[in-house]
């Protein structure tokens, strides 16, 4: 499958996230540090970044540099008033969907043939992922990557009703 034909979708909010040095905002991967529109994080757990439903994100992603990639869907500090459901990510260069902190719930997710992790959780994400399916291909690294907080803010998330089908390599 073709990959990297375009960047990806980034949604940035003002919900709590755990950063090194306990700063309240951070620049998201993939956006130059000179762009203030790339900041995410804050203290509003109920932050509302809108509604994303019935979206297919295909053949995107980019590796800009070491530790600086664009995922199919990047959620940075997105709050729990945001609606995210019925999202499909197909053949992305890096992660399918990555949660950088935040409190948003996401349901009915499908990730197919991503290059790195299908679902990636970082920076004290504190929402729920429910009803997700992951299909790994020979190009895929992992079904999930889960990292803890980077600062003192702790998070507690729930992952339920997830199916991961491995690849034959």
Predicted segment positions?
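Beta-strand/loop edge motif enriched in small/polar residues
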Residues: 1-169
